[in-house]
Every structure is written in structure tokens, then in C-alpha cells.
Amino acid sequence: MQPQSKDPCQELHPLVSTLAASIRSSWQKLPELAPLCTADDLKAIHGELDGETLFIGNELYQCRGFRKIHLEIARLGNGLQILHCVWFPDPQYDLPIFGADIVAGPAGISAAIVDLSPTSGELPDPVFKGLEAIERPAFRQVRDLPGWGTIFSSKVCFIRPDGADEEALFNQVVIDYLEVLSDCASRANPESPTTVSTINRYEGQLNYCLQQKRNDKTRRVLEKAFDPEWADRYIELLLFDNPPTP
């Protein structure tokens, strides 16, 4: 694996760049934000897939209320681009999991999803009310969730944006969702690690990670570009690592 001569994050699809900037701006407002220690070989990754250069860049943080905040941007040659972001809460806090993903190619954005996913059956009441107050755009191409999509809330937004106008609207939806989450996080207090509610949220987050790992497309791409052992390490330790036992 060799570094590229130019910045692989240049010339990204406009929505990938815009959404990444929106997410970074949102996490700057979080309390006690600090970098999360990560193995050097998992921060900036270069490989090759089908003769094209694959780059994966990762940014990781933690803060009060969230055990891990992860933004991943991947690019394959001049074609496929992926933005993946997850904010995993500390199970002692009654907060949902934020998740957003974009898949872009030469023909544009094929998939865009954002959700605040519950870890204890249903969304916390302040989060649900906050999302209810958001005026959702009438996107023209709503996509069906995968079979393992039961982990998502009723407020999940999964679309194929139809043009630059809908791409801008989707970016605003993500900003709105993050504002709701950030506001709730600023007012949340930790519960004891031994309470039933904390344990339930821990188990709910375990299930979320388990279901996300069922996405075989991710594993196949990583195995082909690197090797099965490396792919397993990347998925288990970085993408969807289990929360620490309370």
C-alpha cells in the first residue's frame, strides 16, 4: 500500500464535501470534545481494488455523552465515493445513535441516509419531539430499507437525491437532526452503569453494531482491496466496535 501523490479528498462530490463540513461543524459544539486514540494504520488507508486506487480517511473523536464520533470518507479512483458517519453514545446516557451515509458515483448520488436510531426500543421523548418539529422535504425518490433496517427509527430518511436542490435539502435534514441530538446531549446526565436502562441501551447498541455488520458489501470490498483478516479488524475495531461493558 503506497501513498498517493495528490490529496485523495480533493474533487469529491459536492454533497460529500458539504455534508462532511456540516458534520464537522456540528461536533465542534459538543461538550468536552477530544480526539479518540486510533491505530495509525487505520487513520489514512491506501489500497488497490480492480486496478484503481482506494483511499479511506477516518476522523475520530469522543466527548461527554458519546463514546465515539466517527467520520469516514472513502474514494475509489475517480468513481465511487462514500461518506459514512456514526456517533455512538455512551450507554449511560439516554441518547440515540446518529448515522449518516452517502454513496456517490459518476452518475451522482445513488443513496443518502440519515437517522437517529434508538438503542432501547424507542427514541427518547425529547429526541422524538425534536424530530417531529422538523419539516421534512417531500423527496421524489424514497428508497426501501435493507432487511436488517429494523435498527432504524420511524424518522429515518433514506433517499436518492434528485438533483442539486434535493442534495441541499438532504444536507439541511442532517444538520437539523444533529441540532436535535446536540441539544439533547447538552442536557443529558449519565445514569449508573448498573441500572436496567443503561444495560438495555448497551444491549441495544450491541444489536445495532451486529446488524450493521450484516452488510456484506462493505466486507467484500475491504477483503478484495486488502485481505479478510484486515477487513475483519477494520470492521470490528473501527467501523462497528462493540461498546465497553457497563
Swiss-Prot record:
Keyword entries, A-Z: Oxidoreductase
Protein name (record): Phycocyanobilin:ferredoxin oxidoreductase
Transmembrane regions listed in the UniProt entry: none
Leading EC class: oxidoreductase
Annotated EC: 1.3.7.5
UniProt keyword Oxidoreductase, yes or no: yes
Catalysis performed (reactions): (2R,3Z)-phycocyanobilin + 4 oxidized [2Fe-2S]-[ferredoxin] = biliverdin IXalpha + 4 reduced [2Fe-2S]-[ferredoxin] + 4 H(+)
GO biological process: phytochromobilin biosynthetic process
Pfam family, one: Fe_bilin_red
Gene3D superfamilies in UniProt: 3.40.1500.20
HAMAP family reported for this sequence: Ferredoxin_bilin_red
Disulfide bridge partners, by residue number: none
Family (UniProt): Belongs to the HY2 family.
Originating organism: Synechococcus sp. (strain CC9902)
Function: Catalyzes the four-electron reduction of biliverdin IX-alpha (2-electron reduction at both the A and D rings); the reaction proceeds via an isolatable 2-electron intermediate, 181,182-dihydrobiliverdin.
Keyword Oxidoreductase among UniProt keywords: yes
GO molecular function: cobalt ion binding; phycocyanobilin:ferredoxin oxidoreductase activity
InterPro entries: Ferredoxin-dep_bilin_Rdtase, Ferredoxin_bilin_OxRdtase
